[in-house]
């Protein structure tokens, strides 16, 4: 969006900025409608409605690198007014849970406003990481221009890679997802340039036009790209009927099941927004359609895990605007699905079986001695873990240890011939350090984690953080 805004004529650029501001307002309206509450009573036991946000918005036109980056910061005051006139603090529990749903609301609203104003169409980027959620870009905007104006992100990613490499050298393992987040934050700060001298919008647009001409091969190519983006080929929007809603609700549920075992309304609402964008709908009833999909998924396709409310009916002063009790937390109900419960039952049944393949105890002891000779001595607990998992015959075993506890190393001394004879297959929930050396010790090629690139023919159920699953 920022690339097109930077090089389009002033009239079009103004409409793009208006669409952005309208999408920001839609996201704030979502927060006010669904996620903004305060707390009253002893220990804040009552969650109550408030009149709205008090906030200041600041729109920036570029990044620290000087690239076009139209974005708005919204500084929110922590005080809100309750319906009885008191000024109290925001209940951050719900606001935190709703962050991603608010972000997806902005994304959907932006596409909708740009299509209504300028006929702009979005599509999924073809070079995106298949392990991540798809990124949508404006049809007709040259990817080379987007890459040229992503200098800030490129510098962060480069530094993050360097920090991750250094982390692995220092700790003998790759960083966990949480640690990668901290490394990304560190990279963001370390690569943050000093603020450049202020430039007027006219000066910025002249500079951006020159840069775009260099990337695309001349000013005529820039004009042609803008024309293509503003006049995309038309696609037929699906007919919104009961069949479409049912199919979309099924897709929402499938996406939820692929990423989590339980969910709340915020997860459903965020995924519903993604499905509506992917369908390229032109309806002006997006909000109503999102609500309909959320209701379909939660009421007809999900199984509630939260115990039902008691039969006590509070008086009106103790109920929120939607009729719910002030003694409940909005959006806190947990749900799952039949498929998740069936998978859980299969795991439990498998965990009760002890007829799996085993390795001879003598072979396990010899492998441990071989590990000592090769400089990989294990302590008593680690050695016991290897013996137990190799010889127990249990169909499903779980090793729980702190992240970075070198769980994969415990399996490294497993006897080569024993594993080969037993036909065992090791599966790591996360990419282990030095996978090839472990595989060589086991006498077989390395397998792949579901979170790592590479071929894989099996799926591993979600495991607790800091755990390694072994199925026989």
What are these regions (language model features)?
Residues 1-472:
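Helicase P-loop NTPase motor core of nucleic-acid translocases
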């Amino acid at each position: 969006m920022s690339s097109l805004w930077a090089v389009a004529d002033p009239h079009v650029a103004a409409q793009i900025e208006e669409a952005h501001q309208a999408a920001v307002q839609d996201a704030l309206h979502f927060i006010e409608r669904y996620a903004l509450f305060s707390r009253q009573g002893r220990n804040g036991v009552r969650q109550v409605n408030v009149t709205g946000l008090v906030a200041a918005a600041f729109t920036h036109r570029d990044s620290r690198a000087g690239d076009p980056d139209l974005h708005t910061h919204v500084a929110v005051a922590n005080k809100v007014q309750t319906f009885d006139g008191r000024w109290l603090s925001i209940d951050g529990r719900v606001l935190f849970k709703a962050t991603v749903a608010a972000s997806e609301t902005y994304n959907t609203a932006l596409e909708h406003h740009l299509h209504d104003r300028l006929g702009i169409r979005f599509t999924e980027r073809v070079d995106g990481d298949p392990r991540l959620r798809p990124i949508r870009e404006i049809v007709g905007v040259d990817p080379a221009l987007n890459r040229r104006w992503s200098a800030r992100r490129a510098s962060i990613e480069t530094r993050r890679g360097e920090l991750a490499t250094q982390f692995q050298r220092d700790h003998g393992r790759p960083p966990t997802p949480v640690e990668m987040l901290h490394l990304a934050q560190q990279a963001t700060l370390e690569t943050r340039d000093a603020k450049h001298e202020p430039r007027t919008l006219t000066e910025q647009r002249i500079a951006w036009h020159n840069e775009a001409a260099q990337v695309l091969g001349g000013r005529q190519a820039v004009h042609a790209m803008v024309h293509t983006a503003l006049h995309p080929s038309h696609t037929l929007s699906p007919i919104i009927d009961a069949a479409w809603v049912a199919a979309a609700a099924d897709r929402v549920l499938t996406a939820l099941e692929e990423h989590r075992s339980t969910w709340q309304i915020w997860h459903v609402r965020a995924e519903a927004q993604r499905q509506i964008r992917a369908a390229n709908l032109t309806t002006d009833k997006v909000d109503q359609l999102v609500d309909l999909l959320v209701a379909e998924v939660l009421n007809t396709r999900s199984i509630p895990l939260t115990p039902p409310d008691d039969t006590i009916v509070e008086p009106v002063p103790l109920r929120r605007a939607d009729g719910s009790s002030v003694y409940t937390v909005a959006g806190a109900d947990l749900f799952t699905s039949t498929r998740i419960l069936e998978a859980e039952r299969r795991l439990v049944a498998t965990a009760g079986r002890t007829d799996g393949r085993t390795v001879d105890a003598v072979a396990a002891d010899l492998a441990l001695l071989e590990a000592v000779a090769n400089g990989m001595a294990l302590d008593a607990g680690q050695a016991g873990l290897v013996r137990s998992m190799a010889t127990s015959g249990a169909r499903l075993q779980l090793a729980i240890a702190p992240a970075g506890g070198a769980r994969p190393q415990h399996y490294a001394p497993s006897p080569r011939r024993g594993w080969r004879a037993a036909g065992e297959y090791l599966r790591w929930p996360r990419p282990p350090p030095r996978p090839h050396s472990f595989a060589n010790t086991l006498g077989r090629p390395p397998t792949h984690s579901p979170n790592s690139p590479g071929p894989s023919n099996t799926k591993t159920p979600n495991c607790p953080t800091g755990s390694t699953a072994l199925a026989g």
